[in-house]
A protein has these predicted regions:
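Contiguous transmembrane helix-bundle modules in multi-pass membrane proteins
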Residues: 86-288
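Periplasmic/ER-lumenal interhelical loops and adjacent helix-loop junctions
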Residues: 1-82, 180-232
Length: 289
């Protein structure tokens, strides 16, 4: 089979699972920060502008990233709430499967190594993070199941206080992720830490400048993270309000229509980061292929 380090090159690093509902939790797609005009606007010390512009927009654990595997802030919010509030027994195997998918998508951990060593054909996969395809089915499935329960006004797990507690607690988690960026992990990769250390050894007289660059890079990446964490908080809060309306028997066409609108706005807004309206010109590289 393939070498373990080779198999896990594109698996999630620490905290990268947050990118499932915070697209830029680890910077999104790889590439120079200078290509992102908004990100460059976060630079405070312009003495480091050139170096920041050349730094990688992505700081996760994968060898390279073409963009986050984004499931949606609204969809993930509904999924999380559904695990607590639906009475269906299916929520238990769904929860176990979701946790298993996250563990197998991670770069570290003994579970992945056990699967590589013992599970038939598992060591033939180049990117075991593909297991997240299962999560891409589970999240919308549970979200739709939960909305169906609300639409039909079926009973939910627990009383109203429990319902409000789960919804409020989920929004609180989004608030904590926004207010405390360090919860997501480091904003400097292990390779960058190594590079900064080597620069400091080679040019000790420039230690102040090196530390300043490192601090500025962390600041810019924190700002990139917070922009999307704030976005997720907004959608979580909006979804929470709509759930409260649904639970209080407000016109179901209204809350369901608005929920659908927020899902579309949430997804399309992120999709457009990787698409543009530029026409494909005749004779371009894409057409030639």
């Amino acid at each position: 089979g393939l070498d373990k380090s080779y198999i896990l090159e594109y698996n999630f690093g620490a905290g990268e699972g947050l990118s499932l509902f915070i697209p830029n939790a680890k910077g999104g797609a790889g590439g120079p920060i200078g290509n992102d005009e908004k990100a460059m606007g976060y630079v405070e010390d312009y003495n480091y502008s050139e170096q920041i512009a050349q730094s990688n927009h992505y700081w996760g654990g994968q060898l390279f990233s073409g963009g986050a595997i984004y499931l949606g802030a609204v969809a993930f919010f509904l999924f999380f709430v559904a695990l607590f509030l639906t009475k269906d027994a299916i929520r238990f195997p769904v929860f176990v499967l979701a946790v298993l998918c996250m563990l197998l998508a991670a770069k570290t951990g003994s579970l992945n190594h056990w699967f590589i060593d013992h599970f038939p054909m598992y060591n033939k996969f180049r990117d075991s993070k593909m297991i997240l395809v299962v999560l891409q089915v589970l999240v919308p499935m549970m979200a739709i199941l939960f909305l169906d329960k609300l639409w039909k006004e079926e009973s939910l797990q627990g009383d109203k206080k429990f319902h409000y507690g789960v919804i409020g607690g989920t929004v609180l988690i989004a608030l904590i992720l926004f207010a405390f960026p360090s919860v997501s992990g480091s904003f400097i990769t292990a390779e960058e830490v190594k590079q900064f250390g080597e620069y400091a050894k080679q040019k000790p007289e420039q230690l102040g400048m090196i530390d300043g660059l490192k601090t500025e890079l962390i600041h810019v990446r924190e700002a990139i993270y917070k922009a999307d964490a704030g976005r997720t908080l907004f959608f979580a809060f909006a979804a929470a309000i709509l759930l409260l309306l649904a639970m209080n028997k407000v016109n179901r066409y209204l809350w369901l229509g608005l929920m659908g609108l927020f899902v579309v706005l949430d997804q399309v807004n992120v999709d457009l980061r990787y698409l543009n309206s530029d026409p494909i010109e005749e004779g371009s590289e894409v057409l030639e292929k």
